[in-house]
C-alpha cells in the first residue's frame, strides 16, 4: 500500500497571503508619502507598523515551519524555498520602510517626479506579488506575474537613472544629490525584491510540475 502524503499546512499559505497584503499596504503608504508631503508623519508611522507586521509574519512562518507553532500538515513546498520566500517578502517591506524613513531623516521638503513614478512601479509590482501568492493555493505557474514584474523592474531601472541624471543636470547641492540617490536606491531595491519573489515562485511552480 502506498504511503499517504500529509495534507498541506493551510496556515502557512494563509501567512504568505497575509504577507502579500502587507507588502501591498507598505507600497501604497510609501507612494502616498512621496505624493503628499504635508501628511508624511502619520503615513510614516503606518509604514513603520507595516514593517513590524512584516517581521511578525516572517517570525510566525519560520516558527511554524520549525514545528514551534500550530503547524498542521506538511509545508506547501520545500523548506528552503519557504525560508527564502519569507526573507525576500520581508525585504520588500524593509526597503519600503527604509525609503520612508530616509525622507524624514534627510528632511526632504519636495518630491521628485521620478521618485513618485518609481513608487507607482513598486505599487504595481507589489500587486503582482500579492496576486501570485494567492495563486499558491491553486498551483498557478506565475508566468504572467513574472513577465509583468520584470517589465516593471526595467521601468524602475529607467526611472532611477533618469532621476539621478536630473539631479546632476540641475546642479543642485551635492548633499541633496547624495540623499536622493540613497532614496532612489532603497526604492529600487524594493522593486528588485519583488522580482526576486517572482523568480522564487516560478521555481516553486516548476518543482511542482516535475512532481
Report each predicted region and the residues it spans.
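Cytosolic, long alpha-helical scaffolding segments
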Residues: 1-211
Amino acid at each position: 500500500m502506498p504511503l499517504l502524503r500529509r495534507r498541506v499546512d493551510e496556515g502557512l499559505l494563509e501567512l504568505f497571503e497575509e504577507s502579500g497584503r502587507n507588502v501591498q499596504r507598505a507600497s501604497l503608504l510609501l507612494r502616498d508619502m512621496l505624493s503628499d508631503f504635508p501628511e508624511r508623519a502619520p503615513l510614516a508611522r503606518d509604514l513603520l507598523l507595516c514593517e513590524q507586521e512584516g517581521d511578525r509574519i516572517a517570525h510566525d512562518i519560520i516558527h511554524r515551519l520549525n514545528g514551534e507553532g500550530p503547524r498542521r500538515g506538511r509545508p506547501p513546498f520545500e523548506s528552503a524555498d519557504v525560508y527564502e520566500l519569507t526573507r525576500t517578502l520581508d525585504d520588500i517591506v524593509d526597503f519600503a520602510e527604509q525609503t520612508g524613513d530616509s525622507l524624514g531623516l534627510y528632511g526632504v521638503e519636495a518630491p521628485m517626479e521620478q521618485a513618485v513614478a518609481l513608487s507607482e512601479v513598486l505599487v504595481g509590482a507589489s500587486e503582482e506579488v500579492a496576486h501570485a501568492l494567492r495563486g499558491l493555493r491553486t498551483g498557478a505557474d506565475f508566468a504572467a506575474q513574472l513577465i509583468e514584474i520584470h517589465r516593471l523592474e526595467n521601468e524602475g531601472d529607467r526611472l532611477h537613472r533618469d532621476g539621478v541624471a536630473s539631479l546632476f543636470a540641475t546642479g543642485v547641492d551635492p548633499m541633496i544629490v547624495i540623499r536622493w540617490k540613497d532614496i532612489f536606491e532603497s526604492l529600487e531595491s524594493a522593486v528588485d525584491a519583488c522580482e526576486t519573489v517572482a523568480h522564487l515562485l516560478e521555481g516553486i511552480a516548476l518543482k511542482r510540475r516535475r512532481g
